[in-house]
Amino acid sequence: MLYGDRSIENTDGTIRSLSNRHVQMIAIGGTIGTGLFLGAGTTISATGPSVIFIYAIMGLFFFFLLRALGEMFYFDSNSHTFVSFITRYLGEAAGRFAGWTYWIGILFACMAELTAVSTYVQYWLPGLPAWLIEVSVLGLLTLLNLTAAKLFGETEFWFAMIKIIAIISLVVTGI
């Protein structure tokens, strides 16, 4: 359990250093993806406000999908990932396939994020090569992920806060 900002030691000797506010802001910040800033403008200009309807439909779909997954985790708390459910109900081969395709998908998503960051930075610093920006950001993110969990959570908390403030500012100035 997470209690405020205190670290809790688990029965296996590990320590949970992320507080409830860290976990909540990591979840909120994770839902506000780069595509919202980079790709939404082009999509909205091409399709108009109907894209909001599509976002709502997809959001509703994923809401129910994650509710169902949450029910499965509640029913069987020994399973730690969706891959364990796939392995149990569809077999070892399907579970292995799902695990590897998920890993490859995350790898591609990370590379897309690095490309988006270099696009943003090159807007302000056009002379900087994209590969240098991407390697620098990758190194910074690696260092951030190698730090203590509490520092990682605090950094992610403030990055998510910046995203939320940026979205609210864009909506307010757009009105």
Swiss-Prot record:
GO terms for cellular component: plasma membrane. It is a multi-pass membrane protein. It comes from the Bacteria. It is found in: Cell membrane. GO terms for biological process: amino acid transport; transmembrane transport. The keyword Transport applies. Keywords: Amino-acid transport, Cell membrane, Membrane, Transmembrane, Transmembrane helix, Transport. Its main location: membrane. The chain crosses the membrane at residues 25-45, 46-66, 97-117, 124-144, 155-175. The keyword Protein biosynthesis does not apply. Gene3D superfamilies: Amino acid/polyamine transporter I. PANTHER family: D-SERINE_D-ALANINE_GLYCINE TRANSPORTER, GABA PERMEASE. Belongs to the amino acid-polyamine-organocation (APC) superfamily. This is Uncharacterized transporter in pepV 3'region. It comes from Lactobacillus delbrueckii subsp. lactis.
